[in-house]
C-alpha cells in the first residue's frame, strides 16, 4: 500500500508525477480550487475582522472525498499545488479540510513546490519541504475578499442605475476603461491630410528610393505640404533644379547592436503568441498548461515540456543555462555564444513567487524532435518558448545602417537609408514581434549600392504621395496585456481571465483581432468613471496590486489594507444608491428634438439593450422605442439616423389575407405575417426588403415547421417530432425517446404517453437542486484560521442560499 499522498491541481500533472514517484506514492488531483466563498451576502464580514465563509465547490466534492479517503491510510501528505498565490491558497484549503476531519493529528503534512515537472525537480522538491506560506495565503484571501466586496456591492448599483444583470470588477473595470477611452480617442480623432515626396534614383548598380527631408532650405516635416496643389508645385521646383540627377552630399555608416529579448514571462508569452501565432490569451494559457503538465512522448511516457507558465521572473536555472549553451555551441557554433550567460533583470518585485522564466524543461528536446507527439498548436507554442529561451543566451545581432543624403541644387535634400545584418547573432534563432512597425523596420534588410560623397546619381523621377493621419489603433489582446502590465494592473495569473470576463459579459466585442466596446460596456465604464472614479483609476488599482504584493512578501498585514479600502468604498456605494437616476448614470444620451412631434429624442440602455426613444416618461403619451441596427451605437448615432429607425415596423402589403410587415426587435430584423415571425437573413435589409422576399422567408419557415411534426394527437399536447438527433416525443415539458424498432408515425397516444413516463426528460435544463447544508464552512479570522462551529454550519440552509444565488450573485464576482 502506498505510504505517501501527494496532491496536485490537475489530473494530467498527477499522471506525469505518478510515473516519476513509483508505488510508494499516491498522486491525486484537487481539480483546481476546492472551496470558494459561500454564494450569499455576508460571505466576507467587514464587521467581524473580514471573516470569510467558505463552501465546498460542488463539482469538486468527489475529488475532496477521494483525497480524504487516501489521507486516512497515508503515512505522510505532500501538498504540491502550483508555486504561486492561488496554488498556496488551494494547499491551505485542503489542509483546513483535512484538519477539520481529524486526519492530521498523527501524520506530517508538508508543502512542496517546483516550477517544472521533471523527475529531478519533483524529487528535489520532496527533499526540501516547507510549511504553507501564510503570507501568500493572506495575499490571495485579501484579493478574493476585495473582489467579492467590489462585485457584490457595486454590481447591484449597476443593476438599478444602468441595466439588470451587469457586473463590475476591481481589475476588470479599469481594463474596460482602457478600451473605452481608446474608442473615444478614435471617435474624436480628426484626420489630417499630408503629402510626402520621394526621389526614384537609377544608380547603375541598383535602383533605390530616397525621401525628401529638406524643401526650399527648410526641414521637411509631416505637415509641410497638406494639399495636392502645393505638392505638385514642389515636385516641379525640385525637378527643374535637379536636371535629371542628384548630388551626394553625405554618406554615413553606423553599426549598432540589437540584444536578444529575455526569456518569456507570462505577459510576454501571451503577447508574442498573439502577434506571431494569432492565439488568444486564454488559448495560450490552456496550451501552455498542457505542455507544463505533461505530454506523452512515446516510450518515454508523459513528460513536462515547459516550466510553470504563470511567472514574473526572467531567471534561468544554472542547469538550464548550461544545457542551452551546449545547444547553441552544437547547432550555431561557439561564435554565437557570449563569454558568460546573459543575465536579465525582472521588473516585478514579486518574481520570487515563481522562480524561473517560461522555458523548455530540457533544451535538448528540440521542437523538431517533439513535433510527432504534439498537436499543431502545441508544437507552435513549444517552438516559440524554445526559440525565445535559446535566443536569450546568444550574442547580440550587429546591424549596419547606411544613410545617404542627396541634394537637388542647394535647397532640396533627399535621404536614403538601408540596414543590413552584419552578424546574425540571436536573429539566427528568433526575432521578437512588434505591434506597430516604424520607419527603421521598413529599412531593415534593404541594401543600398556603394556610394561616395561628391558623386552624382541619375534621377529617374520625383513622386508625390498623399497620406492621411490615422487614429490610434484599437487594443489587440497583445497590446492590452502590455498596457495592463505597464500600468501595473493585474498579475500573470489574471490577464487571461480579465479579458475573458469582458468578452463573456459582452462589454467588448472582437472586431477582427481588436477589442471594440459595446454600448453596454461603454455605459458601465462611463458610469463607473463618473461616480466611482477612484476605483477605476489606473494608479489606484496598480497601488492596490502593489500592496497585495507587499502582503505576499510579509511586509504588510491584510486586515489594515481591507479596512483602508472598505470604509470609504462602502460610504460611496450607499450614497450613489440613492442619489443617482439613469440620466446621471451615463446610460442616456440626448440627440435632439423630433421635428414631427417636437419631442426629445434620446439614445439609452434599455431592458433589452441599446435603443433610441422619442418622448419621456413625463409626457402625456407613452414614449416610442426603436432598436438599433447592427453596428450602430447610442454614443455615435445622429438624430437623423435615430428618427429613421422609427419607420419600423414597415407594412409591406397583404398575403393570404393577412398583413405582412417587417421590424427590428431585440433579436434583430424580422418579418411577420399573422402570428408567424421569421428572422431576416444577413443579406436582407429591413428598410428595403419587398413583399415577395418577406413572404418567401415566412413560407419557408412554415414549411420547415410542418415537416418537423410527424404526428399530432387529438385533444393532447403530445406530438411526435423530428429533431436534430432523430424522431422523439414531446408534450412541451418532457422529451421522450422512440425505440429504434418502432415507426414514429405508427405510435398511438397511449404508447406515446407510456414512452414519456419511461424515458421522458425535461425539455429544458433546470438549475441544480443539490443540497449545500451538509457542507463545511470555515472563516478566515484576523488572528487565526479556524473552522465554524456546527451551529454556524446549519445556518446555511438550502433555500436561502439558492434564493441568494438567484438574487445577488448573478453579477458574477470578478476581478
UniProtKB/Swiss-Prot annotation:
Belongs to the type IA topoisomerase family. It catalyses: ATP-independent breakage of single-stranded DNA, followed by passage and rejoining. The active site is at residue 308. Monomer. Its cofactor is Mg(2+). This is DNA topoisomerase 1. It comes from Xylella fastidiosa (strain 9a5c). Its EC number is 5.6.2.1. InterPro entries: Topo_IA, Topo_IA_2, Topo_IA_AS, Topo_IA_cen, Topo_IA_cen_sub1, Topo_IA_cen_sub2, Topo_IA_cen_sub3, Topo_IA_core_domain. Keywords: DNA-binding, Isomerase, Magnesium, Metal-binding, Topoisomerase. Residues 167-172 are annotated as: Interaction with DNA. Releases the supercoiling and torsional tension of DNA, which is introduced during the DNA replication and transcription, by transiently cleaving and rejoining one strand of the DNA duplex. Introduces a single-strand break via transesterification at a target site in duplex DNA. The scissile phosphodiester is attacked by the catalytic tyrosine of the enzyme, resulting in the formation of a DNA-(5'-phosphotyrosyl)-enzyme intermediate and the expulsion of a 3'-OH DNA strand. The free DNA strand then undergoes passage around the unbroken strand, thus removing DNA supercoils. One of its GO terms (biological process) is DNA topological change.
Amino acid at each position: 500500500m502506498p505510504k505517501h499522498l501527494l496532491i496536485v491541481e490537475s489530473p494530467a500533472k498527477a499522471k506525469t508525477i505518478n510515473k516519476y514517484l513509483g508505488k510508494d506514492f499516491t498522486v491525486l488531483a484537487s481539480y483546481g480550487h476546492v472551496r470558494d466563498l459561500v454564494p450569499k451576502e455576508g460571505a466576507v464580514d467587514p464587521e467581524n475582522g473580514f471573516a470569510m465563509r467558505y463552501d465546498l465547490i460542488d463539482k469538486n466534492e468527489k475529488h475532496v472525498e477521494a483525497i480524504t479517503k487516501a489521507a486516512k491510510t497515508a503515512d505522510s501528505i505532500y501538498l504540491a499545488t502550483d508555486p504561486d498565490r492561488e496554488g498556496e491558497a488551494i494547499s491551505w484549503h485542503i489542509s483546513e479540510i483535512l484538519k477539520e476531519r481529524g486526519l492530521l493529528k498523527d501524520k506530517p503534512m508538508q508543502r512542496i513546490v517546483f516550477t517544472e515537472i521533471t523527475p529531478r525537480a519533483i524529487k528535489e522538491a520532496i527533499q526540501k519541504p516547507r510549511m504553507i506560506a501564510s503570507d501568500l495565503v493572506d495575499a490571495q484571501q485579501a484579493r478574493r475578499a476585495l473582489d467579492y466586496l467590489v462585485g457584490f456591492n457595486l454590481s447591484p448599483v449597476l443593476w438599478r442605475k444602468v441595466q439588470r444583470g451587469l457586473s463590475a470588477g476591481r481589475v476588470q473595470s479599469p481594463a474596460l476603461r482602457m478600451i473605452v477611452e481608446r474608442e473615444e480617442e478614435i471617435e474624436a480623432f480628426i484626420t489630417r491630410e499630408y503629402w510626402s515626396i520621394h526621389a526614384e534614383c537609377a544608380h547603375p548598380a541598383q535602383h533605390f528610393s530616397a525621401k525628401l527631408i529638406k524643401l526650399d532650405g527648410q526641414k521637411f516635416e509631416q505637415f509641410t505640404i497638406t494639399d495636392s496643389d502645393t505638392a505638385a508645385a514642389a515636385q516641379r521646383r525640385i525637378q527643374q533644379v535637379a536636371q535629371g540627377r542628384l548630388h551626394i552630399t553625405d554618406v554615413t555608416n553606423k553599426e549598432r547592436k540589437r540584444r536578444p529579448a529575455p526569456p518569456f514571462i507570462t505577459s510576454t508569452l501571451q503577447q508574442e503568441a498573439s502577434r506571431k501565432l494569432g492565439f488568444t490569451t486564454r488559448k495560450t494559457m490552456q496550451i501552455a498548461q498542457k505542455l507544463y503538465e505533461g505530454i506523452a512522448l512515446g516510450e518515454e511516457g508523459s513528460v513536462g515540456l515547459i516550466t510553470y507558465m504563470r511567472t514574473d521572473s526572467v531567471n534561468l536555472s544554472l542547469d538550464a543555462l548550461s544545457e542551452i549553451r551546449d545547444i547553441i555551441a552544437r547547432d550555431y557554433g561557439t561564435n554565437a555564444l557570449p563569454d558568460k550567460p546573459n543575465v536579465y533583470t525582472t521588473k516585478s518585485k514579486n518574481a520570487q513567487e515563481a522562480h524561473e522564466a517560461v522555458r523548455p524543461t530540457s533544451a535538448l528536446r528540440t521542437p523538431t524532435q517533439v513535433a510527432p507527439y504534439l498537436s499543431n498548436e502545441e508544437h507552435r507554442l513549444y517552438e516559440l518558448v524554445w526559440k525565445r529561451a535559446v535566443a536569450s543566451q546568444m550574442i547580440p545581432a550587429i546591424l549596419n545602417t547606411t544613410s545617404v543624403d542627396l541634394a537637388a541644387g542647394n535647397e532640396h535634400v533627399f535621404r536614403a537609408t538601408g540596414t543590413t545584418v552584419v552578424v546574425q547573432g540571436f536573429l539566427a534563432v528568433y526575432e521578437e514581434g512588434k505591434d506597430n512597425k516604424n520607419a527603421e523596420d521598413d529599412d531593415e534588410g534593404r541594401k543600398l549600392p556603394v556610394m561616395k560623397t561628391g558623386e552624382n546619381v541619375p534621377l529617374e523621377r520625383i513622386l508625390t504621395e498623399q497620406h492621411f493621419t490615422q487614429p490610434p489603433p484599437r487594443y489587440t489582446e497583445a497590446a492590452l496585456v502590455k498596457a495592463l502590465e505597464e500600468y501595473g494592473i493585474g498579475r500573470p495569473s489574471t490577464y487571461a481571465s480579465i479579458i475573458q470576463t469582458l468578452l463573456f459579459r459582452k462589454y467588448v466585442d472582437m472586431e477582427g483581432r481588436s477589442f471594440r466596446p459595446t454600448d453596454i460596456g461603454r455605459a458601465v465604464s462611463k458610469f463607473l468613471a463618473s461616480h466611482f472614479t477612484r476605483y477605476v483609476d489606473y494608479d489606484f488599482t496598480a497601488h492596490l496590486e502593489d500592496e497585495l504584493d507587499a502582503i505576499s512578501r510579509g511586509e504588510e498585514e491584510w486586515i489594515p489594507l481591507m479596512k483602508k479600502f472598505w470604509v470609504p468604498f462602502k460610504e460611496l456605494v450607499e450614497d450613489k444608491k440613492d442619489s443617482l437616476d439613469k440620466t446621471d448614470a451615463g446610460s442616456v444620451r440626448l440627440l435632439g428634438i423630433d421635428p414631427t412631434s417636437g419631442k426629445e429624442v434620446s439614445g439609452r440602455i434599455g431592458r433589452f439593450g441599446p435603443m433610441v426613444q422619442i418622448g419621456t416618461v413625463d409626457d402625456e403619451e407613452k414614449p416610442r422605442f426603436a432598436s438599433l441596427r447592427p453596428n450602430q451605437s447610442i454614443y455615435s448615432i445622429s438624430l437623423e439616423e435615430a428618427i429613421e429607425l422609427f419607420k419600423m415596423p414597415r407594412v409591406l402589403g397583404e398575403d393570404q389575407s393577412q398583413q405582412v410587415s417587417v421590424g427590428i426587435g431585440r433579436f434583430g430584423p424580422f418579418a411577420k405575417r399573422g402570428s408567424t415571425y421569421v428572422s431576416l437573413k444577413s443579406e436582407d435589409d429591413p428598410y428595403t426588403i419587398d413583399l415577395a422576399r418577406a413572404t418567401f422567408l415566412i413560407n419557408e419557415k412554415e414549411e420547415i415547421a410542418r415537416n418537423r411534426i410527424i404526428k399530432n394527437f387529438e385533444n393532447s399536447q403530445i406530438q411526435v417530432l423530428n429533431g436534430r438527433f432523430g424522431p422523439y416525443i414531446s408534450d412541451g415539458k418532457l422529451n421522450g425517446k422512440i425505440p429504434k424498432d418502432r415507426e414514429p408515425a405508427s405510435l398511438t397516444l397511449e404508447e406515446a404517453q407510456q414512452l414519456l413516463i419511461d424515458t421522458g426528460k425535461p425539455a429544458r435544463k433546470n438549475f441544480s437542486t443539490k443540497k449545500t447544508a451538509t457542507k463545511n464552512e470555515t472563516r478566515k479570522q484576523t488572528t487565526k484560521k479556524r473552522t465554524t462551529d456546527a451551529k454556524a454550519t446549519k445556518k446555511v440552509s438550502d433555500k436561502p442560499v439558492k434564493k441568494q444565488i438567484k438574487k445577488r450573485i448573478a453579477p458574477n464576482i470578478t476581478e
